[in-house]
C-alpha cells in the first residue's frame, strides 16, 4: 500500500505514522507524536490516543466521550506551524492548525500542544489556544487575513 499519510507529511503511511499506530515503535519527537495523534483521530484509534496521553492526564476518564465524538467528526487536514524542544530536551511544543467537520459543520483547531518525555517516550500533556487577531494572517496557511478566512466561521 502506497497511501500518503493522513498527517500531511507527504510520506507513505507505512513509513510515517503507521508504525506508531500499529504499536511497533514510539515517536521520537513531539512533532512525530502530534502527527500520529492527528492520524489516530482521523482513523478513530482510541487505544492509541489514550496511550499517547501522559499518564497524569487520566485519559481513560474521558475515553467514552471521545469515542462518542468519532461518529460525528471527520478530519480534513493538518498544518504544522512550528515545533520547539526546550533545552531540557524533555519538554516540547508543537503549534498546528487542523481542519475538521463536526456534525457536518466545518471547523478548525489551532493549538499549541505541550509534550513531555519520560523514559525516552514522548507523551501529550495539554494544549493552549494561541490568540489570532482579526488582521493577522490566518493560521491555516491561506495567506489571507484571519477575518477574511477562518475567522468568518
Swiss-Prot record:
It holds the Pfam family SEC-C. It comes from the Bacteria. InterPro entries: NTF2-like_dom_sf (IPR032710), SEC_C_motif (IPR004027), UPF0225 (IPR023006), YchJ-like_M (IPR048469). NCBIfam families: PRK01617.1, PRK01752.1. Belongs to the UPF0225 family. This is UPF0225 protein ETA_15740.
